[in-house]
Amino acid sequence: MELNATKRVAELTSDSPYDRDRYGRPLVPDDILERMTKVTTEEAWGVLDGHDYKLQFEGGWANLQPQRILVGRAVTCRYVPQRPDVHDVVHEEARANGRAGEQSCWAVDTLEAADVLVVELFGKVACGTAIGYALGSAIARRTGGTGLVVDGGIRDMQQVAGLPISVFCRGVHPSVIDGVTLVEINGPVRIGRATVLPGDVVLGTPTGVIFVPPKLAQEVVEQSEQTRLRDYFGKMRISEGVYTPGEVDRAWSDDM
């Protein structure tokens, strides 16, 4: 068994135009990530919907840092309810590959700058706490302060809320993670109604989280920039009395 199947990652993301890391993930350039921080959820959704990516958004989160915008490259991991024989095979793979610590550490240990941990935990909160303060601190250090999205819970909320990371989770519980097995790192995961692939650009806002395929990331930021420029021009012309709000809101004439 191979928890992190590099070849499979490359096959699943073969339409990405970008370089890849050692795990096969597409690496959307830092410049695009920086520009993505100014994109609204609605702007990103509009581009994705136009390309028939209709199930890339998930809402209804407990957002520990609503004043922060989360942007980064997805590192995915998937848990399943614990079954003894599967659990034993996974831990044998971990020993064979020198993985240190508990299974909740393994995906965190792969994180690099500007990565976002995306955890499929089938909505489990009690005993589904993907991180606490120690792992949250490790995420902050390894990523430079991005964060995580977990379809499950976290613990140590009072301490985690003080870390310089964004956290989107389903809830908080004092228990430790238990009764689950990590079966895959950097494979497809289901987060609510969305399918996420490793290397997707994660955009988390007060609205929710949207997952942008790498091949569409540049189009998303360019469309957003055009929208902001149009909005700025329209507001300026309205304030100057040149155009009315009705003229600005409709399709623009050649003169405009």
What kind of region is each of these model predictions?
Residues D30, E34-P198, V212-M256:
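Feature captures the catalytic cores and cofactor-binding loops of soluble hydro-lyases/lyases
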Residues T207-I210:
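Channel- or pocket-lining gating/hinge segments that regulate access to a cavity or pore
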Residues M1-R22, D31-R35:
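Short acidic, Pro/Gly- and aromatic-enriched capping/linker segments at domain boundaries
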Residues V196, L203-G204:
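A structural signal for short secondary-structure junctions
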Residues G24, A140, D200-V202:
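Buried hydrophobic positions in well-ordered alpha/beta secondary-structure cores of metabolic enzymes
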Residues G153, G204-T205:
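A short, compositionally biased micro-patch
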Residues R20, L148, G204:
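Short glycine- and Lys/Arg-enriched binding-loop motifs that mark or flank ligand-binding interfaces
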